[in-house]
Amino acid sequence: MNNKTTMLIDADVLAYQSAFTAQANIQWDEELWTVHTDLALAKTWIVDRLETFKKRLKADDFILAISDKNNFRRKLFPDYKANRRSKFAPIGLDPIRAWMAEEYGTVIYPNLEADDVLAILATERPNRSDKRIIVSIDKDFKGVPCTFYDFNRGELHEITEEEADAYHLMQTIAGDSVDGFKGVSGIGQVKAKRLLDTNGASWETVLKAYSDAGMTEEEALTNAWMAYLIRKDEYNHKHKKLKYLWMPKEFTTAQKRKYSHIIHGVTGELDEDLTRPDPF
């Protein structure tokens, strides 16, 4: 029996955190300030983190995932993560990404975020003999049936498929201000979870929350697509594209066909205008 443990690491987070750690403001005189990054410091920080993760999780190997410059979610919702576009990215970010790719190798799937890549690799686990652990700080991974290590909090989570599906529905109702999509007005995560616990973790509960707020089924579906991380059966590795988008299990064939034009828009070739915006 193969007892190998592989860490699936969110390299986007490592790149950002190391770049901010290595960045410094320098005052040369009363009116002259500059910003610089010590790439050697950033590289050392990443190496130390990887060793810490390996010891903490008793891991044998790791895979680093990076987000593609294109993102299928922007075709569905152009304002997805738009709130991040005006933020100043650390100046060493691109060189650090390039160094990780050269030093360790990084995995990028066309049109997907690093989170999607990790979710796909994690949900392949039933067909593999190794144990896989997602390593990140992103609570969105509670919406994936997986083992998830939140390294900011030092917490290890074993998430069942039932728990993951319920978390996804909760995010659909509550929205995610960090990712820039709003859910039902006046309903946060606590209230959304209470609704699902009381009325059942179903699409019917989600739709009623939207309907009561004067919102449409399509708005609910769009938010569900924003919140959902792609799993193994939904991505075509050979052709490097999405096979299909998540749909409520309660949907009939006729209901699915109603949204087929939207689905076909993102399961084909994606437009170049979905490129990740320049951070400056």
Regions found by a protein language model. Name each.
Residues 2, 33, 59, 83-280:
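Extended two-metal-dependent nuclease catalytic cores across DNA- and RNA-processing enzymes
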